[in-house]
């Protein structure tokens, strides 16, 4: 069966590295395929981004479906008030204690609650990782500004202190999911609730629409996509993505620069 004949499938799509490249160039060929598929299927963007910085891609695709933000910590439907919003947060007290106990090695940090952005300070280190457009920015000491639990948090440190911060955060691994990563010599520890994942969000959306998991497809390139790619029927990793998901995903497709998503649908027999 060709992709044009697909009907009542849930198709989950990561944004960065899947439909846009590292320079934010949009894969228009894949966008057009997704637009065509959205006529008879549920297209769900599944991203670590907040809503405000994924909204443009939701609108570009002209979607009428739920969206997964913060890697599953916030799931909502911008056009359907009957869809029950799902928000999972991290314990504020653990986050504040982590910051206090490691204040000598932390360079900067931020956390978000929907589109409220709590930031320790603005500097060149953090600028590439935050989207101020549409955000309600709250600056300063989190002990004074943060009044409730957040969707997640990102903490910046030096290379020499990276392992120390990871090891400390792992003391709370029963409550907090830790994702350490490095990007262009920036060392980051990302924190989420242990109960969040893109996979869990996808299964909840399948239940809402009464879609069998045999009718699920997902595309992604990062380690945060692994659970999503392994919970669906057709999990597709983008070439050039994280080595672990390339090993574990059932299918691979060319990179976003080579219009991998579009090529998969055009060449695959379902």
Regions found by a protein language model. Give the residues of each.
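Non-catalytic pre-domain segments flanking phosphatase-related domains
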Residues: 1-13, 32, 36
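Mg2+-dependent phosphoryl-transfer enzymes with acidic/Ser/Thr/Gly-rich catalytic loops
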Residues: 2-8, 26-27, 190-270
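Active-site phosphate-binding/coordination module
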Residues: 25-126
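Active-site metal-binding loops of divalent metal-dependent hydrolases
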Residues: 17, 49, 220-222
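Short, structured coil segments at secondary-structure junctions
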Residues: 61-63, 71, 171-173, 231-232, ...
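Conserved acidic, metal-coordinating active-site core of Asp-based
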Residues: 105-108, 112-219, 223-226
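Asp-based phosphoryl-transfer active-site loop
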Residues: 7-24, 45, 229
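Short active-site oxyanion
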Residues: 40-44, 63-65, 151-152, 214-215, ...
């Amino acid at each position: 069966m060709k992709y044009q004949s697909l009907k009542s499938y849930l198709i989950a799509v990561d944004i960065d590295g899947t439909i846009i490249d590292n320079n934010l160039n949009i894969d228009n060929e894949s966008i057009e395929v997704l637009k065509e598929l959205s006529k008879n299927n549920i297209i769900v963007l599944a991203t670590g981004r907040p809503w405000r910085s994924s909204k443009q891609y939701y609108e570009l695709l002209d979607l009428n479906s739920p969206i997964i933000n913060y890697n599953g910590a916030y799931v909502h439907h911008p056009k359907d008030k009957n869809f029950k919003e799902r928000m999972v947060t991290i314990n504020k007290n653990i986050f504040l204690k982590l910051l206090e106990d490691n204040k000598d090695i932390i360079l900067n940090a931020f956390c978000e609650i929907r589109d409220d952005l709590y930031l320790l300070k603005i500097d060149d280190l953090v600028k590439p990782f935050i989207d101020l457009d549409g955000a309600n920015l709250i600056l300063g000491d989190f002990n004074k500004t943060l009044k409730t639990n957040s969707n997640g948090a990102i903490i910046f440190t030096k290379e020499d202190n990276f392992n120390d911060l990871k090891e400390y955060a792992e003391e709370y691994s029963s409550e907090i999911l830790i994702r350490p990563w490095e990007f262009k010599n920036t060392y980051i520890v990302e924190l989420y609730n242990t109960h969040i994942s893109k996979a869990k969000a996808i299964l909840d959306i399948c239940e809402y629409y009464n879609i069998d998991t045999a009718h699920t497809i997902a595309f992604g390139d990062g380690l945060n996509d692994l659970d999503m790619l392994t919970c669906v029927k057709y999990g597709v990793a983008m070439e050039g993505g994280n080595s672990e998901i390339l090993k574990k995903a059932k299918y691979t497709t060319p990179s976003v620069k080579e219009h991998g998503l579009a090529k998969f649908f055009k060449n695959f027999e379902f």
